[in-house]
């Protein structure tokens, strides 16, 4: 992470809310109260930001995705730019209740929106009645506002980043119910315990929001680079294994078995057969029969 505490100071990250609006649970991150304003400890902000960046980098590097949420006026453009540069889903308009806790219904609505877009592109919408086309286009405008940033989201996000915990309290609560880790900027009027990775800082000033979001974007981009490198290495390893397997099969097929001649047993008459001294197939030897002697007649005694 290239952001230093001095950079955070120059961006005004240390300015909290008025002391009368502070949340007692933010006390561990408050350095002092001056002129009725809570001053945030930038040392703790820097440590928390570094920890959050490491978490998001590992999450994205392992194949996860991050949902960027910032619907307040100061954060809209920054969040949209950050999500677009990292190809991540985002929400910069009104948070639609149930986006995380009732995702299956939202997913069907997104599929319907994509169907309308396809009909408009292919010209099939022109085949419908003008009254029906007008109704569909009005619905598409509403869907565009609600789903434009999450149309290509494959499923529930692996993690979520929010700019203002209080302003995005519904989104934060849904993430907690869905078991999704949440990283966010937490001002002195917010409860940091609602986030898994709170970043204490000014969530109202544009400069403060931008410097923190830029650090988050850099971490996500590093995670994407790690993911691509791992996929490339895995692909190369698979190709190498496939080539080795193919070579092994070919070698086994073409190999000639070796014979140890010292262990071959020869028949006893092999020498006679080789030298031609054995029996001939052309003139087989026939065993001679012994002559049979004629029996003499018996002489009777007188």
UniProtKB/Swiss-Prot annotation:
A GO-annotated cellular component: cytosolic small ribosomal subunit
Basic residues biased stretches: 287-302
SUPFAM superfamilies per record: Ribosomal protein S2 (SSF52313)
Residues annotated as signal peptide: none
Keyword match Ribonucleoprotein: yes
GO biological process: translation
Sorted UniProt keywords: Ribonucleoprotein, Ribosomal protein
Disulfide bonds: none
A family per Pfam: Ribosomal_S2
Region (Disordered): 275-302
Molecular function GO labels: structural constituent of ribosome
InterPro entries: Ribosomal_uS2, Ribosomal_uS2_bac/mit/plastid, Ribosomal_uS2_CS, Ribosomal_uS2_flav_dom_sf
Family listed: Belongs to the universal ribosomal protein uS2 family.
Protein known as: Small ribosomal subunit protein uS2
Organism for this UniProt entry: Opitutus terrae (strain DSM 11246 / JCM 15787 / PB90-1)
Gene from which the chain derives: rpsB
């Amino acid at each position: 992470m290239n952001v230093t505490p001095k950079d955070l100071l120059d961006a005004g990250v240390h300015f909290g809310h008025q002391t009368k609006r502070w949340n007692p649970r933010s006390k561990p991150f408050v350095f002092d109260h001056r002129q009725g304003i809570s001053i945030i400890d930038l040392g703790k902000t820097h440590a928390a930001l570094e920890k959050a960046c490491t978490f998001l980098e590992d999450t994205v590097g392992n194949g996860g995705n991050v949902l960027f949420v910032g619907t307040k006026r100061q954060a809209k453009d920054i969040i949209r730019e950050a999500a677009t540069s990292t190809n991540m889903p985002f929400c910069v308009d009104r948070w639609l209740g149930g986006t995380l806790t009732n995702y299956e219904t939202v997913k069907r609505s997104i599929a319907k929106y994509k169907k309308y877009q396809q009909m408009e592109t292919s010209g099939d919408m022109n085949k419908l009645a003008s009254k029906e086309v007008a109704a569909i286009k009005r619905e598409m405008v509403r869907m565009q506002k609600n789903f434009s940033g999450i149309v290509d989201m494959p499923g529930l996000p692996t993690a979520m980043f929010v700019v203002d915990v209080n302003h995005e309290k519904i989104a934060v609560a849904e993430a907690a119910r869905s078991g999704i880790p949440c990283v966010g900027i937490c001002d002195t009027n917010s409860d940091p315990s609602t986030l898994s990775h709170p970043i204490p800082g000014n969530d109202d000033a544009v400069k403060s929001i931008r410097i923190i979001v830029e650090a988050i974007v850099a971490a996500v981009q590093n995670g994407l680079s790690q993911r691509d490198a791992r996929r490339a290495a895995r692909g190369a390893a698979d190709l190498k294994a496939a080539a080795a397997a193919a070579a092994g099969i070919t070698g086994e097929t073409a190999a000639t078995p070796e014979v140890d001649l010292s262990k071959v047993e020869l028949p006893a008459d092999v020498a006679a057969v080789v030298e031609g001294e054995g029996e001939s197939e052309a003139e087989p030897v026939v065993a001679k029969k012994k002559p049979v002697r004629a029996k003499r007649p018996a002489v009777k005694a007188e």
